[in-house]
Amino acid sequence: MKKFKYILVAARAAVTLFSCKKDDDKPAPVPVPTPEAPKTVAEAKTDDKEKTYTVRLQNTTGTFVMGYNDLMLSVVDAAGKEVALEAATFTPWMNMFKGDGKGGFIKEVDFTHSCPHTPLAKEGNVWKSQALFQMKTGPSGVWFATITFKVAGKEYELKRLDFEVKPQPNKALGTVNRFKLFSGDKGQAHLYALVAPESPKAGENEIALGIWKMENTQSFPQVTNWVVEVKVSEKGSTAAISTATLRYERGFYRGKVTYPKAGEYTLSYTLKDAQGKAVQPQDNDKKDISIATTIQF
């Protein structure tokens, strides 16, 4: 009987040990990242007599930069409580000032232009947009937004919400650049910018390139039907260390390139139309140019 008790105790200990071992072998749960709280870039009261609502442009950093930006629209009441919007629009503008004839500018508006941006779209309870700011705020011009929205069937407007666009601090994205395509004497300006990855690594990276046609000062549709060949070379060299074909998908021209190590690289682009015919970028003087983005990480 005593022997049986010893066997039973040993068996229970083995089961307990095995159970603990099984629990220890289970992978630890992957922590779910907490979304970053939005930070206000700029805010102002609505234009109605009562100044009923405060309108805020927000993102995760609290700063707009020259280049591609995600943004959110928030509207709060006098108590600071966010209100539900039934509809909303966002249009960015830049006032360009007249020159003073001495290399500077005077605070008199010469003309106003917009920039590439997407219509506000509701995701859950958040209204979101993306904008490509092609210039930074400076002596030559300032940015502002016109915003409309509807609450409980009533429409409100904010004709001018001033905000600042700062220089792009992320060298991994390079800068916004432009080129022209000529048909006769009239040139059609285009903008292009690398929008991803924001944090490249040594090895393979998926890149995303945006190209926009400047139809006029208000309209900047994306070019979606080209093919872009990209060649990656190290600074000071023209030898290709990686090449890829970028095709339009998920909002941008995408493909994968390889960086052998952290450093400074030039991404040179060759453009082709839908029929495979070369598209030759030119400058304002109709001279053929090469287009590229220089990055560093």
Kindly give the residue locations of the regions a language model identified.
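Residue-level recognition of secondary-structure-to-loop junctions
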Residues: 121, 133-137, 149, 247, ...
